[in-house]
Each structure stands twice: as structure tokens, then as C-alpha cells.
């Protein structure tokens, strides 16, 4: 613990919280173009092939976005919208790709939580 004299000489530094989604530039979503669509494996103890895409955003950032839901139609040069939100078991994946927006189709046969996956209401 510092003495009073030490604090007078050098006051305490204010701890600034770092931005968890710097590529969004304080916007709720950003548009981008897929440069690579691939699968990757999660950290231990989980095991799967998670679908992700490398996206070049309109502001020049290149980020990795997670593609949620079962099945997708994304390929290289698809135009997508990303939002913030990391995937805990995929290191480096700090963004989600929005389903049912721009070139990304919604999840087929989705009955519950449809708004999260861009699925229309079943007839």
C-alpha cells in the first residue's frame, strides 16, 4: 500500500475498461463480406465442428464471426451483418453473424426462439 507522499507524487491511475467489440465502432451492427467460411474445433472439454466465417467489415476490420443455428448458406463473398457477442469455447471469435439478414438465410424448421435465428412463423 502506498504512503501519502507516494500518492502525492504519483496519483492512482484510473482503470479504463477495454472495449470487447472494437470492430463495431460503437455501432449495434456492422456489414461485411465473408472472405473465408470454415469450421473450427472448440477448447477443451468440448468437442464439435463449429461453423465460423472470416468477415471483412465496411470499416476495414477483418474479424471472425460465429454462424449460429443448424445449417447455413454462407460462402465466400456473401454479404453478412455482424453483432457483438463472443463464443466462450472458441478463442478469437468475438462476433456473431445475424441470421435472416442480407445474404444469410434463416434457420429452416425452427419453432422456438425464431427471432434469434431469422426464421419466419410457421403456418
Swiss-Prot record:
Keywords: Methylation, Ribonucleoprotein, Ribosomal protein, RNA-binding, rRNA-binding, tRNA-binding
Sites bearing 3-methylthioaspartic acid, chain numbering: 89
UniProt cross-references to SUPFAM superfamilies, sorted A to Z: Nucleic acid-binding proteins (SSF50249)
GO-annotated cellular components: small ribosomal subunit
Keyword match Nuclease: no
InterPro entries: NA-bd_OB-fold, Ribosomal_uS12, Ribosomal_uS12_bac
A GO term for molecular function: tRNA binding
A Gene Ontology biological process term: translation
Assembly description: Part of the 30S ribosomal subunit. Contacts proteins S8 and S17. May interact with IF1 in the 30S initiation complex.
Role noted for this protein: With S4 and S5 plays an important role in translational accuracy.
Family statement: Belongs to the universal ribosomal protein uS12 family.
NCBIfam families membership: rpsL_bact
Protein name (database record): Small ribosomal subunit protein uS12
Species name: Methylobacterium radiotolerans (strain ATCC 27329 / DSM 1819 / JCM 2831 / NBRC 15690 / NCIMB 10815 / 0-1)
